[in-house]
């Protein structure tokens, strides 16, 4: 009983609540009120009771140029509705039988226009359907009050940023006549849009109607064929004067039955118009508007307006007469660009240039050729950008001739900053390209060196080892090390030329890397003398193997010493090292030290002769080669790798190496010192002479001055002290003599 009472009370409260809700003006309307305009034709409005488009009741009203005028016209043709605002529709519509002024009934081919929706009562945002795999988004800007087309562009670009297509959208927060502060929209993937479009083609009855629902709609009803195509064709065939309308006499011969059937078909076409517009149809309308020629109109007003010029790909000012014309007519350049920038033909994405391909592809044996190609492409792209900026600069200066001097300076400063930004961007891209190239070259060199070293060690471990194979692999290994050294030195020379500060920073890493190369070669060569039979056979060919590639053309660079333990002597580039220079015993089977057979002549850097035979404290095996086992060799390689990782591998991915001056010239230093001493002596003598001359004064004797003399006599005495002689006195003295 209690549950029944509660249910009755709830039902009464619901009915009471529903009776308090005011009735909406649009209740009972078949479709939403809309108006459409086409310059040169009578305005059209849709009949909200039957969904058909009808001409202007007065037969005089044509296209309007202001939003206020459109709102007023909506209020005139729909006096029974409370029209409060207007907004452009999301989709174009096809309207038939559009009459010229002065003709109330006519039959002409179809015109496609974007109508204006007449909003009734308080603004209510459109409800949007969100299909599967689609996203609902919205944007609000409370400090902006923009048009419908502006927010359509915002929604389209937002979907494009997500690699999706705009499916549907609606305005938010009205702030004026056809002005809003936001937009809500639905973005769908491209494949979803294609499925939606295909389903629309298969059956138009599945679309959403304008405003209310069709009372005769059912899922089993056959699709209503569109009359637009063949009506347009028939009308065009009957158009003899080519003005787009049928001739006058055709209106008089129209059969009432045919006219009634035509009205029914027209109603069906209007009823099948949907709100789920595709982006392509909107783009077609925007393109038709923005690519039209600018028209001043018949009136003689002088209004400054903007129209879009597709050839120049920008908006251009023109003078509008105040009436007529077309829709390629905008109040500001910003509004013009916001609407028409999307109508430009989208350029197909160009294939990736050589720079992008270089960064995407891994390094291979064609590294140098790929790098050269990428560098040329980068320079060509930079020149093209600079040429474009220079052309824009010339155009801006030509347009700024009549501007004030401050504006001219602002234009010049703007383009100077633009050029500087392009230069900085190009420099950064070059630096990135060079660093990538150097890292890849270093990786290739490391790979080749590691491979040749493994092959060389494998040949030494062979049983029995073959001398010719060992020599060949030794040459390849030494060549790989020399390429690494040359690469390091050349790169350092480049860095020192371009950026001396960076060269000073990476100098310690350069020295460490060069030292590691020498230590690696020393240890690898020391292993050769653990195989006396091979060493004795190829000792005369060791020098060509190690020294043939040691003719480094890099200026101021000294070829590496491949003796047992390299000493850099008095080289100013190298830090002080405590290298052992004590002579050691002769090697196995009377072999001399490696510096006698390997060393290259070096007159500037003294190298003490040392024996390359490994000693026990170096951690190398000293047993005969017959007892040298395969599992003992990695110990040497491990030590080498440790030295390498400690001295070089830490930096090779980020640092680039090039050599500084390796040799020192004592004669030049002594000459500079002597010259400096001579110059200093000359300067000191000159200063002493000048100072002595400064204190020299003229004295012609001592004149005793009485303290009681007058000021005139005292002044005369001072003058005489400085060499003054009274000519009168001198004359009388000469007369007396």
Curated annotation (Swiss-Prot):
GO terms for cellular component: cell surface; early endosome; Golgi apparatus; Golgi-associated vesicle; membrane raft; plasma membrane; recycling endosome. Residues 690-737 are cytoplasmic. Functional neuronal receptor which couples to intracellular signaling pathway through the GTP-binding protein G(O). Keywords: Amyloid, Copper, Disulfide bond, Glycoprotein, Membrane, Metal-binding, Protease inhibitor, Serine protease inhibitor, Signal, Transmembrane, Transmembrane helix. A motif (YENPXY motif) lies at residues 724-729. Residues 354-545 form the E2 domain. It is found in: Membrane. One of its GO terms (biological process) is axonogenesis. Cu cation binds at residues 148, 152, 169. Disulfide bonds join 39-63, 74-118, 99-106, 134-188, 145-175, 159-187, 290-340, 299-323, 315-336. The record marks 300-301 as: Reactive bond. Its main location: membrane. One of its GO terms (molecular function) is signaling receptor binding. PANTHER family: ALZHEIMER'S DISEASE BETA-AMYLOID RELATED, AMYLOID-BETA PRECURSOR PROTEIN. This is Amyloid-beta A4 protein. The keyword Cell membrane does not apply.
């Amino acid at each position: 009983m209690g549950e029944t009472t509660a249910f009755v009370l709830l039902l009464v409260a619901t009915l009471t609540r529903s009776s308090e809700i005011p009735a909406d003006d649009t209740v009972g309307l078949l479709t939403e009120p809309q108006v459409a305009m086409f310059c040169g034709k009578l305005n059209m409005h849709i009949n909200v009771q039957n969904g058909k488009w009808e001409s202007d009741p007065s037969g005089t009203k044509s296209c309007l140029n202001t939003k206020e005028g459109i709102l007023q016209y909506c209020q005139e043709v729909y006096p029974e509705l409370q029209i409060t605002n207007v907004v452009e529709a999301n989709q174009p519509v096809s309207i038939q039988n559009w009459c010229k002024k002065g003709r109330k009934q006519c039959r002409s081919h179809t015109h496609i226009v974007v109508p204006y929706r007449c909003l009734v009562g308080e603004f209510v945002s459109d409800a949007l359907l969100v299909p599967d795999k689609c996203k609902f988004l919205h944007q609000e800007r409370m400090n902006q009050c923009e048009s419908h087309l502006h927010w359509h562009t915002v929604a389209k670009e937002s979907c494009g940023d997500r690699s999706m297509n705009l499916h549907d959208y609606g305005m938010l927060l009205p702030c004026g006549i056809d002005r809003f502060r936001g937009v809500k929209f639905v973005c769908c993937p491209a494949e979803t849009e294609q499925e939606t479009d295909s389903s629309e083609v298969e059956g138009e009855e599945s679309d959403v109607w304008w405003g209310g629902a069709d009372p005769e709609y059912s899922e089993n009803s056959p699709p209503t064929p569109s009359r637009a195509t063949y009506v347009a064709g028939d009308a065009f065939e009957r158009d003899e004067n080519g003005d787009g309308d049928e001739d006058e006499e055709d209106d008089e011969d129209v059969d009432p039955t045919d006219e009634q059937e035509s009205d029914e078909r027209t109603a069906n076409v209007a009823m099948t118009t949907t709100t789920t517009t595709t982006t392509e149809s909107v783009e077609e309308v925007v393109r038709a508007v923005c690519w039209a020629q600018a028209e001043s109109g018949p009136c003689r007003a002088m209004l400054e307006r903007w129209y879009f010029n597709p050839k120049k790909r920008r908006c251009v000012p023109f003078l509008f007469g105040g009436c007529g014309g077309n829709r390629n007519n905008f109040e500001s350049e910003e509004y013009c660009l916001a609407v028409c920038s999307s109508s430009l033909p989208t350029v197909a994405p160009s294939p990736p240039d050589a720079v992008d391909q270089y960064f995407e592809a891994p390094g291979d044996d064609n590294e140098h050729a790929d790098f050269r190609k990428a560098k040329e492409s980068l320079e060509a792209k930079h020149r093209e950008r600079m040429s474009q900026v220079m052309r824009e600069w010339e155009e801006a200066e030509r347009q700024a001739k009549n501007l004030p001097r401050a504006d001219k300076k602002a234009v010049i400063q703007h383009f100077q900053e633009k050029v500087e930004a392009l230069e900085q961007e190009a420099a950064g891209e070059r630096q990135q390209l060079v660093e990538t190239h150097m890292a890849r070259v270093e990786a290739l060199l490391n790979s080749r060196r590691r491979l040749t070293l493994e092959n060389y060690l494998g040949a030494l471990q062979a049983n029995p080892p073959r001398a010719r194979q060992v020599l060949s692999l030794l040459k390849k290994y030494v060549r790989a090390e020399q390429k690494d050294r040359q690469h390091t030195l050349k790169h350092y020379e480049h860095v020192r030329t371009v950026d001396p500060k960076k060269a000073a920073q990476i100098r310690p890493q350069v020295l460490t890397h060069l030292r590691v190369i020498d230590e690696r070669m020393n240890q690898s060569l020391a292993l050769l003398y653990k195989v006396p039979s091979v060493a004795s056979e190829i000792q005369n060919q060791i020098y060509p193997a190690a020294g043939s590639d040691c003719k480094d053309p890099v200026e101021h660079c000294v070829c590496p010493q491949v003796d047992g333990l390299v000493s850099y002597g008095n080289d100013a580039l190298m830090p002080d090292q405590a290298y052992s220079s004590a002579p050691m015993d002769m090697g196995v089977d009377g072999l001399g030290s490696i510096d006698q057979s390997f060393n290259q002549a070096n007159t500037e850097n003294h190298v003490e002769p040392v024996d390359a035979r490994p000693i026990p404290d170096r951690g190398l095996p000293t047993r005969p080669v017959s007892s040298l086992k395969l599992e003992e060799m990695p110990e040497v390689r491990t030590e080498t790798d440790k030295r390498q990782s400690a001295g070089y591998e830490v930096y090779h991915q980020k640092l680039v190496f090039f050599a500084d001056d390796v040799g020192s010239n004592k004669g030049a230093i002594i000459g500079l010192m002597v010259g400096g001493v001579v110059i200093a002596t000359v300067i000191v003598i000159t200063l002493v002479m000048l100072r002595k001359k400064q204190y020299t004064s003229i004295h012609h004797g001592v004149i005793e001055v009485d303290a009681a003399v007058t000021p005139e006599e005292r002044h005369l005495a001072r003058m005489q002290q400085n060499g003054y002689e009274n000519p009168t006195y001198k004359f009388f003295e000469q007369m007396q003599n």
